[in-house]
Amino acid sequence: YAHRFYGFKGEAQYLHGHTGVLTIEVEDSVNAGVNMVFPCNEIQKTAWDVLKNFDHALILREDDPLLPAILDVYEKQGIKNGHPNNVMKGEAFKTELATAYPDCRLVVTKETMTVEGMIKIVYDLLKDKLNIAKITFSSGVNKASEEFQTKNQIDRCPLCGIALNENGICPKCGYKKQ
């Protein structure tokens, strides 16, 4: 992702990029059907569904004067509303903390995008999908962690361990809760 610290007086005020590493720890009871809390690959898939919006994206604070200029350039290039080559994108989202515009690879945030800010956004996006106990995010030489109280009662499939949808059906294997 690329970003900058708008209003900051230092190197980070300039537009620059990072590769981030995100670690999500979940906590719950062991699902007797599969003898695990949650399949690791499903944690990754669940997280990636929303977090892929940050991959190769520009992240700007909502009051950054670069934002209208970037959108103007994207409009002139014909890529503001998407492009056939823009295939790595998630579903658009809008929360109190951030809004994703996947068609133009842009995430607009309320706060400056720091590692601490990313943790807040990730937790907000995933708190209803996973029982998150801890999130750690590192980007460049910066790293932060935050622990959370797990409180969700998430119905999970006894056959494959992933969360059932609102109708009590497993989206992976089709199991139906009785």
Where are these regions (language model features)?
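Cys/His-rich microdomains that often coordinate metals
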Residues: 164-165, 177
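Short glycine/serine/threonine-biased micro-segments
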Residues: 15, 166, 172
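Cys/His/Pro-rich metal-binding microdomains
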Residues: 158, 171
